[in-house]
Amino acid sequence: MKFIIKLFPEITIKSQSVRLRFIKILTGNIRNVLKHYDETLAVVRHWDNIEVRAKDENQRLAIRDALTRIPGIHHILEVEDVPFTDMHDIFEKALVQYRDQLEGKTFCVRVKRRGKHDFSSIDVERYVGGGLNQHIESARVKLTNPEVTVHLEVEDDRLLLIKGRYEGIGGFPIGTQEDVLSLISGGFDSGVSSYMLMRRGCRVHYCFFNLGGAAHEIGVRQVAHYLWNRFGSSHRVRFVAINFEPVVGEILEKIDDGQMGVILKRMMVRAASKVAERYGVQALVTGEALGQVSSQTLTNLRLIDNVSDTLILRPLISYDKEHIINLARQIGTEDFARTMPEYCGVISKSPTVKAVKSKIEAEEEKFDFSILDKVVEEVNNVDIREIAQQTEQEVVEVETVNGFGPNDVILDIRSIDEQEDKPLKVEGIDVVSLPFYKLSTKFGDLDQNRTWLLWCERGVMSRLQALYLREQGFNNVKVYRP
């Protein structure tokens, strides 16, 4: 099988040297992502496209899906590459390929040609289109807005029969821009802002301020791992967790109620800036949107920025919440975000929307900054690829099984869309559907006399959720890995 990767248009207008660098980086990213599917896969770069050739037909859908999620790709063409002799040979091959698709449809033929030939692209379009129209009685030519467009590419003595076109996510290849550190909470905003910077070519590391204990961190790890695995797995990134409970405690004890929100954000920026400097990261990324909450007014954002020289990027600054939620739905983080607790919102009952710098600084004089220094010094920094391995160690008391007992039930915790696309059926055992984002509220309603075997395709989510349920006191859970 063969795929032709078309570049994001902004790449094609770069200077020659920059364009070549971008294409080289994108080629490497594609190799890094796809090597998990087929080690014999070949990735070949050209001036205006990249070819991907693979032998394992069983991995075709997985490879195609992975390509649509790699930043820098505008669209993917799935093609059949065959030799040809003349225009009539092109027609005959097109007839075999497209006959079934054109039955009862209106169509047109579009041809791109490279190389030396005794015919033009329009000649091929007319010849093939006329032939298809004659040989498929129920088909009809329509040059504007046809139901089916037959795409052909002729290159020297090769014919590319385009079997399908699939849109990519566009943007720049990861690694073409510098690294950033995303302040991730697991909510709608931070997940979307992280994705937007990945799509713009940045390697995104994650910094999490833990305000809610182990369960909160597990949830945010899931979001970060999902984003990395889905859009950024071509590169290694860090997941940095900072235990911010001592900082919150100090703020609650010593800071005036109205100033708490702004001061908490200032402390977060201070801590994140130190982490960024430690790891050579150039900028911070937040999910703040203008006026969304009290700390996100222009006055307050300026005061928050003042505590650090590190550049702070806010890709969602002009977005409304509905737009952000729609983006979260598109990239797959909506379900995570809906069940993620929001701890920052409860810290202040009457927050100021227009903080005064002198008052903020006066309040911060009461704060013991050694506490902030200590939590930054004790950050937990892990390679995001190790999250699954760490989860295995953390849930060592949760048994992993590949067989069944008489009291066992498989609990499919994938999202509803995934379950509908690939229903799980296992002979001889009941399978119950309960998406992961409903486990925290609905698992207790299940029959607690049964043993529930949590299952997801990769096993990461099932292990994380097993740990969470164990922490909640449910001992009748295991992880199912066939």
From Swiss-Prot:
Q: Which Pfam families match?
A: ThiI (PF02568), ThiI_fer (PF22025), THUMP (PF02926)
Protein name per the record: tRNA sulfurtransferase
- What cystine pairs are annotated? C344-C456
Function in brief: Catalyzes the ATP-dependent transfer of a sulfur to tRNA to produce 4-thiouridine in position 8 of tRNAs, which functions as a near-UV photosensor. Also catalyzes the transfer of sulfur to the sulfur carrier protein ThiS, forming ThiS-thiocarboxylate. This is a step in the synthesis of thiazole, in the thiamine biosynthesis pathway. The sulfur is donated as persulfide by IscS.
Q: Where in the cell is it found?
A: Cytoplasm
EC numbers for this chain: 2.8.1.4
Q: Which residues belong to any copy of the Rhodanese domain? A: 404-482
Q: Superkingdom, according to UniProt? A: Bacteria
Species in which this protein is naturally found: Escherichia coli O8 (strain IAI1)
A GO molecular-function descriptor: tRNA-uracil-4 sulfurtransferase activity
Q: Which PROSITE patterns match?
A: RHODANESE_3, THUMP
Where is it mainly found?
cytoplasm
- What pathway annotation does it carry? Cofactor biosynthesis; thiamine diphosphate biosynthesis
Tell me what reaction this enzyme catalyses.
[ThiI sulfur-carrier protein]-S-sulfanyl-L-cysteine + a uridine in tRNA + 2 reduced [2Fe-2S]-[ferredoxin] + ATP + H(+) = [ThiI sulfur-carrier protein]-L-cysteine + a 4-thiouridine in tRNA + 2 oxidized [2Fe-2S]-[ferredoxin] + AMP + diphosphate; [ThiS sulfur-carrier protein]-C-terminal Gly-Gly-AMP + S-sulfanyl-L-cysteinyl-[cysteine desulfurase] + AH2 = [ThiS sulfur-carrier protein]-C-terminal-Gly-aminoethanethioate + L-cysteinyl-[cysteine desulfurase] + A + AMP + 2 H(+)
Q: Catalytic positions?
A: C456 (cysteine persulfide intermediate)
